[in-house]
Curated annotation (Swiss-Prot):
Signal peptide: none
Keyword Phosphoprotein among record annotations: yes
Protein name: Large T antigen
DNA-binding region: 141-256
Source species of the chain: BK polyomavirus (BKPyV)
Region feature Disordered, mapped onto this chain: 117-138, 634-695
Modified residues (N-acetylmethionine): M1
Function, as annotated: Isoform large T antigen is a key early protein essential for both driving viral replication and inducing cellular transformation. Plays a role in viral genome replication by driving entry of quiescent cells into the cell cycle and by autoregulating the synthesis of viral early mRNA. Displays highly oncogenic activities by corrupting the host cellular checkpoint mechanisms that guard cell division and the transcription, replication, and repair of DNA. Participates in the modulation of cellular gene expression preceeding viral DNA replication.
């Protein structure tokens, strides 16, 4: 490098390259610096043109001189140095020129004999064969495929694997796999010059994980890794011809019983079917209610207080049957899923019934359900008092004239479900009894109460509650423009007016619930209750009948003195209305399937509730007293129990009231209508005052 450039030029070049002078001769470093400085000094980049030219000159000169210095000296000569051929100078020059060449360097100019000139023996001789390269196997032997998993791309995890590789790599992998995966068993088997490694791991792994680990140790050698589906059958095949065992981690190898699972202890499972049957029998549609009710069955029957009281038929009737299953259910981790399936079964059965059963059959089934409940709570094990429910019958019968006919006509309306003649309207002021009667009818027939006072955008899911229901009640509908300023305004009447297709029942409508698909069906019939709001004509045309309620002071006082009616919700119970129908209506008005049961209940009412007792109940109601405050008197005549019409019963009550409650004053005795608690308050009087004499 010292002969390439002089000292001044080399120092100048190093300064231009921006390198230390000690780096002179480091050609790669100088090359990088040169390229970097070209970008810096280039005129197009805003650099110094003079420095660029000077650096290029010095660097090119250095490169040229370095190439010349590294070229070997072959003793070249020019044509002017060679003397003329044939002269003595040329002979001497030729001799001196050849002195440097090796004497052994000699080329024979004689040609070898060609293939055609070869002897006959050489033509027919067999040339030596080249050794063929043995191809690596592409898969396990075919007789082992039935024991191996053929999945290529799978996330399935296994605990048994087989590795097919060369004998040399198998010796290495045998130890590496044992250390890496802490195998429970591993063996190496000979297979056609190669080895198969069979091993079991304590934990499950993917085949790809085993393959990736082995592939690191088999760069050039072939490697095939697969999972094993039939562990013992594969191991047994590898120990027989044409395979044989080379080594294994357990002396004596594996036995068949090593792979047979131990017989676990028989664990009792929850009977989903039993829970579903309970939900269907009780018609439970609430998941959490079913969950809570069934968990109560886990306690001992003999110590159960509910069974001792026998006031809940859905408990004491089924406790003993479901006791064993409830104990297992209490320890289950999927209690909600079991109850959800049971509730879905109840809803599915209801949908099938609405599709295949007539409305009369559905109402008959509902009456049977109520009669079953009455048999329980009024039976030997029940704790309900029949007289209290008959007191509710007497109170409801005083609410409206011919109450039994009102209920009968309403049932006739919703059973036949005639389009545009399906809804009733209960209208009246506060505390007039419209909601009490509506709640009783709803419990008698089965259905849901809906709130239409919501904004229209929220009304969609509220109407979805009516899916597969027998009837609905639009409760306490609010409107605008009421005469009384005390009544709040609302959107209920406007919303009902927008739901004419729902009320008419001529076409099917779409009902939807959250997390459920839309259900297309005829909207169920029912009734509407409201205060004294004006009703538009378009909505009034949808009501087949309107009943106007008026508050009655004697009913309110009697209800206040008979608290058991409110505490036990007797007036809102469907059983009370059914008892009212049994008491007043003839047997022929009921469905044929339940007439025998109706006769039994009529006979029981004959024996337990006399006509005098029922008339005394109505008298106490008219006087505002406690309904069951009855002074029993023995009658000489045999009393006939309540098979009479409502008009006769009410007439008797009216006559008793007028006879026993006459005040001492002459003016009140002559005009019973002046009494505050007279029976005619609120409806037509059946005992009219005497006609005054002509003037």
């Amino acid at each position: 490098m010292d002969k390439v450039l002089n000292r001044e030029e080399s120092m100048e070049l190093m300064d231009l390259l921006g390198l230390e002078r000690a780096a002179w001769g480091n050609l790669p470093l100088m090359r990088k610096a040169y390229l970097r400085k070209c970008k810096e000094f280039h005129p197009d980049k805003g650099g110094d043109e003079d420095k660029m030219k000077r650096m290029n000159t010095l660097y090119k000169k250095m490169e040229q001189d370095v190439k010349v210095a590294h070229q070997p000296d072959f003793g070249t000569w020019s044509s002017s140095e060679v003397p003329t051929y044939g002269t003595e100078e040329w002979e001497s020059w030729w001799s001196s020129f050849n002195e440097k060449w090796d004497e052994d360097l000699f080329c024979h100019e004689d040609m070898f004999a060609s293939d055609e000139e070869a002897t006959a023996d050489s033509q027919h001789s067999t040339p030596p064969k080249k050794k063929r390269k043995v191809e690596d196997p592409k898969d396990f032997p075919s007789d082992l495929h039935q024991f191996l998993s053929q999945a290529v791309f799978s996330n399935r995890t296994l605990a048994c694997f087989a590795v097919y590789t060369t004998k040399e790599k198998a010796q290495i992998l045998y130890k590496k796999l044992m250390e890496k995966y802490s195998v429970t068993f591993i063996s190496r088997h000979m297979c056609a010059g190669h080895n198969i490694i069979f091993f079991l791991t304590p934990h499950r792994h993917r085949v790809s994980a085993i393959n990736n680990f082995c592939q690191k140790l088999c760069t050039f050698s072939f490697l095939i890794c697969k999972g094993v589906n039939k562990e013992y059958l594969l191991y047994s095949a590898l120990t027989r011809d044409p395979y044989h065992t080379i080594e294994e981690s357990i002396q004596g190898g594996l036995k068949e019983h090593d792979f047979s699972p131990e017989e676990p202890e028989e664990t009792k499972q929850v009977s989903w079917k039993l829970i579903t049957e309970y939900a269907v029998e009780t018609k439970c549609e609430d998941v959490f209610l079913l969950l809570g009710m069934y968990l109560e069955f886990q306690y001992n029957v003999e110590e159960c207080k509910k069974c001792q009281k026998k006031d809940q038929p859905y408990h004491f009737k089924y406790h003993e049957k479901h006791f064993a299953n409830a104990i297992i259910f209490a320890e289950s981790k999927n209690q909600k899923s079991i109850c959800q399936q049971a509730v879905d079964t109840v809803l599915a059965k209801k949908r099938v019934d609405t599709l295949h059963m007539t409305r009369e059959e559905m109402l008959t089934e509902r009456f049977n359900h109520i009669l079953d409940k009455m048999d329980l709570i009024f039976g030997a094990h029940g704790n309900a008092v029949l007289e209290q429910y008959m007191a509710g019958v007497a109170w409801l019968h005083c609410l409206l004239p011919k109450m039994d006919s009102v209920i009968f006509d309403f049932l006739h309306c919703i059973v036949f479900n005639v389009p545009k003649r399906r809804y009733w309207l209960f209208k009246g002021p506060i505390d007039s009894g419209k909601t009490t009667l509506a709640a009783g009818l709803l419990d008698l027939c089965g259905g849901k109460a809906l709130n239409v006072n919501l904004p229209m955008e929220r009304l969609t899911f509220e109407l979805g509650v009516a899916i597969d229901q027998y009837m609905v009640v639009f409760e306490d509908v609010k409107g605008t423009g009421a005469e009384s300023k005390d009544l709040p305004s609302g959107h209920g009447i406007n919303n009902l007016d927008s739901l004419r297709d729902y009320l008419d029942g001529s076409v099917k409508v779409n009902l939807e619930k959250k997390h459920l698909n839309k259900r297309t069906q005829i909207f169920p019939p029912g009734l509407v209750t409201m205060n004294e709001y004006p009703v538009p004509k378009t909505l009034q045309a949808r009501f087949v009948r309107q009943i106007d309620f008026r508050p009655k002071i004697y009913l309110r006082k009697s209800l206040q003195n008979s608290e058991f009616l409110l505490e036990k919700r007797i007036l809102q119970s469907g059983m009370t209305l059914l008892l009212l129908l049994i008491w007043f209506r003839p047997v022929a008005d009921f469905a044929t399937d339940i007439q025998s049961r109706i006769v039994e209940w009529k006979e029981r009412l004959d024996s337990e509730i006399s006509m005098y007792t029922f008339s005394r109940m109505k008298y106490n109601i008219c006087m505002g007293k406690c309904i069951l405050d009855i002074t029993r008197e023995e009658d000489s005549e045999t009393e006939d129990s309540g098979h009479g019409s409502s008009t006769e019963s009410q007439s008797q009550c009216s006559s008793q009231v007028s006879d026993t409650s006459a005040p001492a004053e002459d003016s009140q005795r002559s005009d019973p209508h002046s009494q505050e608690l007279h029976l005619c308050k609120g409806f037509q009087c059946f005992k009219r005052p005497k006609t005054p004499p002509p003037k």
